[in-house]
A protein has these predicted regions:
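Active-site-adjacent structural elements that line small-molecule/cofactor binding pockets in enzymes
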Residues: 1-300
Length: 300
């Protein structure tokens, strides 16, 4: 089973950006299989929608390092772990810029990027970037089309409802061909259908507490059915599980969630956000927790 960790990107860690390189190096030395970033712009004072699975907007999202910059740092100080996003909010970005950033990081890392993308959910953040939230689904679909075009063969060309690219040359391509694997987060029937039709895999998440296998198996059943309807092999789709934590969670409890996901939901790749809700108070603390989680999971 592959085990990874979020980079120290949010909350108090954002005020110590040197910790990104330090954690990435030390996580690789301990044998971590992947390193991850998220994508948040602000923490609204009076949110219209709270963070999924909670009744509040986590305070750590008041400060967040740029995900592309954090992944770039991790790319240049490591050689082995996969580098993923969970998730980049695809509708916020012009596809040519998103394609270029991910292709560049894939080049810098020697082909280790996992492009984890989502449709987004915070109305305040959509307004901040000037993108109508009601268009997020259609923009997301078109973004996937445009990424495939930009990462494909020259000449690159795209004509859509929101973006148009005249035929031209884009010679910086991802190392991975035809592009980095694309994993999508999904919470709605339409989102799960999109995963089945278009993605390489699914990015579910679990919040602190006992692990319930149907959090993974239920959506994956619907996703694989959508893949079959689209003429794809349902069993080719992967699952990478995000495990959120919070202050007070025990290392044994975190490891138990990962192990139950492996044994009861056939999850073969999971990553733990040790900085979510202030579980790890420093990079040194995060490194210690990561090492202990790795030891417990790999012992079983």
């Amino acid at each position: 089973m592959r085990i990874g960790f979020n980079l120290p990107q949010f909350g108090s860690h954002a005020h110590h950006p040197e910790g990104v390189a330090e954690f990435a190096r030390r996580a690789e030395e301990m044998g971590a299989d992947s390193l991850w970033v998220g994508d948040r712009l602000l923490a609204p004072l009076e949110p219209e929608v709270n963070y999924p699975g909670t009744t509040a907007f986590p305070a750590e999202f008041r400060a967040g390092l740029d995900p592309f910059a954090a992944l770039t740092v991790a790319a240049v100080v490591t050689t082995r772990p996969l580098l993923g996003s969970s998730v980049l909010v695809a509708p916020w970005y012009a596809p040519p810029l998103l394609a270029r950033s991910l292709a560049t990081i894939d080049q810098l890392s020697g082909g280790r990027v996992i492009a984890g993308l989502g449709a987004g959910w915070s109305p305040e953040e959509f307004r901040a970037v000037g993108v109508p939230m009601g268009e997020r689904g259609s923009r997301f679909d078109e973004c996937l089309d445009a990424l495939a075009a930009y990462w494909g063969t020259n000449p690159v060309e795209h004509h859509g409802r929101f973006w148009t690219t005249a035929a031209g040359y884009v010679d910086v391509k991802p190392v991975q061909r035809p592009g980095p694997p694309v994993y999508l987060a999904a919470f709605t029937p339409a989102g799960m259908t999109r995963v089945g039709r278009r993605a390489d895999g699914f990015l579910p998440a679990v919040t602190p507490g006992p692990f319930e296998p149907t959090i993974v198996t239920g959506p994956m059943s619907r996703i694989r059915a959508a893949a079959a309807r689209a003429g794809r092999d349902p069993h080719e789709l992967g699952v990478i599980l995000r495990v959120n934590t919070m202050a007070g969670d025990s290392v044994h409890g975190i490891a138990e969630v990962v192990l139950r996901a492996r044994d009861e939901a056939a999850v073969d790749h999971a990553f733990v956000d040790l900085t979510y809700r202030d579980l790890a108070t420093s990079v040194e603390h995060a490194v210690d927790l990561a090492g202990r989680v790795l030891d417990l999971v790999r012992a079983r």
